[in-house]
């Protein structure tokens, strides 16, 4: 059976295959994070607006404006133990043209933990393919 994929879907499938060939594992995280993660790391974010809400337990949560901070917050990587992860996630950012939030599909990879020259070259080669 042959499927007609859009160019973005085809690119996503090809990148997934490439990342997995190099040992990267798919990382899936919740749509929500504690707002404090983003408030503490505001300088890391692209914009200064974060879509928030209070959950049923009274905690202030945020719709992810960024994936990297969530991965860092939830990974088991240490200076001795590296993790090679990739993600395909939706993030929520301010649309400055109409002052609304927009949902953006984002794909990326993270090499976390012990970093050496090989790991740097690996990531650079993967993003330049």
Task: Give short role names for the model-derived ranges.
Residues 1-127:
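TRNA-recognition modules of translation machinery and tRNA-sensing kinases, especially anticodon-binding
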């Amino acid at each position: 059976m042959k499927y007609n994929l859009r160019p973005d879907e085809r690119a996503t499938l090809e990148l997934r295959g490439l990342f997995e060939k190099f040992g990267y594992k798919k990382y899936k995280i919740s749509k929500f994070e504690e707002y404090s993660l983003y408030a503490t790391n505001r300088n890391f974010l692209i914009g200064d607006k974060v879509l928030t809400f209070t959950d049923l337990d009274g905690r202030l949560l945020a719709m992810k404006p960024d994936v990297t901070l969530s991965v860092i917050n939830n990974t088991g990587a240490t200076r001795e133990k590296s993790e090679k992860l990739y993600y395909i996630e939706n993030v929520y950012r301010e649309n400055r043209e109409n002052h609304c939030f927009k949902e953006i599909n984002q794909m990326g990879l993270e090499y976390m933990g012990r970093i050496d020259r090989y790991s740097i070259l690996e990531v650079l080669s993967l993003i330049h393919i």
